[in-house]
Amino acid sequence: MQKDYQKLIVYLCDFLEKEVQKKGFKKVVYGLSGGLDSAVVGVLCQKVFKENAHALLMPSSVSMPESRTDALNLCEKFSIPYTEYSIAPYDKIFGSHFKDASLTRKGNFCARLRMAFLYDYSLKSDSLVIGTSNKSERMLGYGTLFGDLACAINPIGELFKTEVYELAYYLNIPKKILNKPPSADLFVGQSDEKDLGYPYSVIDPLLKDIEALFQTKPIHLETLIQLGYAEILVKNIISRIQKNAFKLELPTIAKRFNPE
């Protein structure tokens, strides 16, 4: 197991180096939240680009103070250059203008604010934006379109959340980050498990079977139930996948019109 993950680290570092170079960049930037996924991406980027990998810390008005502390501790441990921009003034303005906004709307606004800061920094510093969404999130559509899902390159987009945990262990990510419940930290009390209804330890095996069995054909409910998955779980996950599949697609553009 250790040997496999050491090989994976080498593979992902090589991927980052080659893909960034292909796009004509020497520097990268990414959002560092204090959570697991961005910590893993941050350490991978630091291994490859050293001082040319820059983290942006962008706490909102509802971010947990410990998220910022965990991000700062990671930067200190791995000598990661960072800049901190508070998005609190902007999300407060949104809240004052849209007092009836749901938590999802407020969360999406914060996610898109962060991506705006990342791409502004990208332009200012001639850096490429690196993504931090894992495969579980991507398959479920558990992310904000043109928010945290937006990036030029994503080294962990084909790793399920449970695999990111294992990779983090071999990258020596602090236990404080490894052990805390996953959360997008977009509103008070939020957690991935509350949003999704299940922990990743339950979701990921199902996602792996869905990918293996139904890559080129429609997902079949009964087949998955016969494998031992609870019907309510399967229905919930299939619904999320189908409802949010558009988030992984490029915009649909009308074909050029050729009048006869």
From Swiss-Prot:
Enzyme class at the top of the EC tree: ligase
UniProt-annotated binding residues for Mg(2+): D37, E137
GO MF annotations, alphabetized: ATP binding; glutaminase activity; metal ion binding; NAD+ synthase (glutamine-hydrolyzing) activity; NAD+ synthase activity
GO biological process, one term: NAD biosynthetic process
Keyword Repeat: no
Residues reported to bind deamido-NAD(+): R112
Residues binding ATP, per UniProt: G31, L32, S33, G34, G35, L36, D37, S38, T132, K161, S183
Quaternary structure and partners: Homodimer.
Protein name from the UniProt record: NH(3)-dependent NAD(+) synthetase
Lineage, opening ranks: Bacteria, Pseudomonadati, Campylobacterota, Epsilonproteobacteria, Campylobacterales
